[in-house]
């Protein structure tokens, strides 16, 4: 049996808002370590990987490994019935047909009970290799979201160039060109505003802005975001949470770097 309680419905809502337009149906894999999800988007261009560790729940119980196949839009609709401050308890039997959600108000004067039908999803697990990335950029999540939105008004592709001068986001479109360059700096008054760049060699890659803009829907989950890049491998965009992470992997566009 699974029983896992979020202290606030807001976290689960934010997680679903970040991934539900990339992935329609997915397995939530529950085991001793916590609840994880790994799924590709329908175009097989982006991969989503999420983990909420068991210590992110209070209480957490999972007697055996369970895969909960869920339509994310259906789950999101049910979660709209919860107030952001509500406690949310997820429950499932060992061979479940439904995921039970119980919403409890802060004052414990309201309890709502919902069941979401589960699906049988045949999903292969992709081994994500551990890569020593050539460039790692950690920056304010809101800044990354702003850059992505701004450049998306001009083009559908962005070239990210990480070098010792800094990291440059540039694009070319029908109505003109645009670029933003960030340089490493430490903000002593607010560490969350610092920009950290770790580099072993320069990297230049081009990506779909539509997907990057989609990833930035995770901005409410974390104040910081980390971009990890190496030539010819997918970009890793990671949002770290208190008890886990949300990671997005995006394959680079081939043969477009020269056009930029």
Swiss-Prot record:
There is a cross-link at residue 164 (Glycyl lysine isopeptide (Lys-Gly) (interchain with G-Cter in ubiquitin)). The keyword Lyase does not apply. It holds the Pfam family PCNA_N. Keywords: DNA damage, DNA repair, DNA replication, DNA-binding, Isopeptide bond, Nucleus, Ubl conjugation. Changing residue 64 to A: Reduces capacity in enhancing the processivity of DNA polymerase delta but shows no deficiency in stimulation of the ATPase activity of replication factor C. The keyword Nucleotide-binding does not apply. It is found in: Nucleus. One of its GO terms (biological process) is error-free translesion synthesis. It comes from the Eukaryota. One of its GO terms (cellular component) is chromatin. One of its GO terms (molecular function) is DNA binding. NCBIfam families: pcna. Homotrimer. Interacts with pcf1/CAF-1 subunit A (via PIP motif); the interaction is direct. Interacts with cdc24. Interacts with rfc1. Interacts with rtf2. Belongs to the PCNA family. This is Proliferating cell nuclear antigen.
